[in-house]
């Protein structure tokens, strides 16, 4: 961690004192602060020291700079890298893709701020970490001259912001994220991701990049079906935000967990219980990872007590 701190301070300057939210929610100032990481994400040095996960994120904002215009018969001199092998196999003669210059790109974040995201045992809640990740992607989109759109889901309502490339639009998104982050501390709702995903599916263009930022605790069959459809049309990223307590059971002892007015006491002395505990979350993660593998999505995990940039550095 000491090396990471020196590296980040070298590129970003000393980190300002924590403002406001104290990990319970992301303040507008904290969301705006995420912009300070953008120059480094775009820098040459970034390519040499980040993990493969971070490289996957960066690739969403680069693209080819072109979009598919048509598919026609292969002609002498065409780039063989543009051959459409599916059409070629079907028609038994070579076909190639023709591309036109892409003016801009749409980047979407589906931000899950429903009830199960209001949980955290170290540093900050999952909802807070997810909010900061969404803000970082937004700033990176604007810097790259892409249009950024966001769907903020609180378990009941979905707040839709259409893609645009403007600071005013970005500020409106950040204000709503912070506002919802405060409100869900008092009243939160459990809901399926299928609701915001269906709204996105109705309007999204092909070749867009979509980041679903969630803990995927409500990753039901309906949500999987919609995401599978989106994966065929877009570059889809599953950003799995989780707490360390969801990764492994705490040390042997008795613990109490509170959710609203409900209280649950559990005993971790028994090794059998600790193994069952670990396997429960490991199996859920494996289901999501298998979905991503099957539908060619990118899976990236962020733990709340590490922060996005620590995650990018840790697989050096």
List where the protein language model places each region.
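Exposed, interaction-prone extracellular/peripheral surfaces
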Residues: 2-57, 73-78, 87, 96-132, ...
């Amino acid at each position: 961690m000491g090396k990471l701190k020196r590296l980040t301070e070298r590129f970003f300057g000393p980190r300002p004192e924590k403002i406001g939210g104290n990990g319970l929610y992301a303040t507008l100032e904290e969301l705006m602060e995420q912009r300070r990481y953008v120059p480094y994400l775009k820098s040459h040095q970034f390519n040499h020291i980040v993990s493969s996960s971070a490289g996957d994120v960066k690739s969403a904002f680069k693209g080819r700079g072109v979009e598919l215009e048509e598919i026609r018969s292969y002609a002498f001199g065409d780039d063989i890298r543009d051959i459409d092998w599916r059409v070629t196999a079907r028609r038994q003669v070579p076909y190639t893709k023709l591309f036109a210059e892409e003016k801009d790109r749409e980047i979407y974040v589906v931000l899950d701020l429903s009830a199960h995201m209001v949980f955290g045992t170290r540093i900050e809640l999952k909802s807070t970490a997810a909010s900061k990740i969404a803000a970082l992607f937004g700033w990176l989109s604007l810097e790259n001259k892409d249009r950024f759109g966001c769907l903020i889901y609180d378990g009941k309502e979905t707040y839709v912001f259409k893609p645009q490339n403007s600071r005013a639009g970005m500020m409106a998104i950040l204000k709503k994220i912070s506002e919802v982050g405060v409100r869900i501390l008092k009243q939160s709702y459990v809901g399926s991701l299928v609701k915001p995903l269906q709204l996105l599916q109705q309007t999204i263009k092909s070749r867009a990049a979509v980041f679903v930022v969630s803990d995927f605790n409500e990753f039901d069959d309906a949500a999987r079906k919609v995401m599978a459809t989106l994966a065929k049309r877009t570059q889809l990223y599953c950003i799995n935000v989780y707490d360390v307590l969801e990764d492994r059971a705490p040390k042997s002892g008795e613990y109490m967990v509170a959710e609203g007015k409900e209280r649950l006491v559990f005993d971790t002395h028994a090794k059998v219980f600790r193994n069952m505990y670990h396997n429960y979350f490991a199996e859920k993660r494996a289901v999501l990872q298998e979905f991503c593998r099957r539908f060619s999505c990118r899976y990236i995990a962020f733990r709340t007590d590490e922060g996005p940039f620590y995650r990018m550095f840790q697989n050096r």
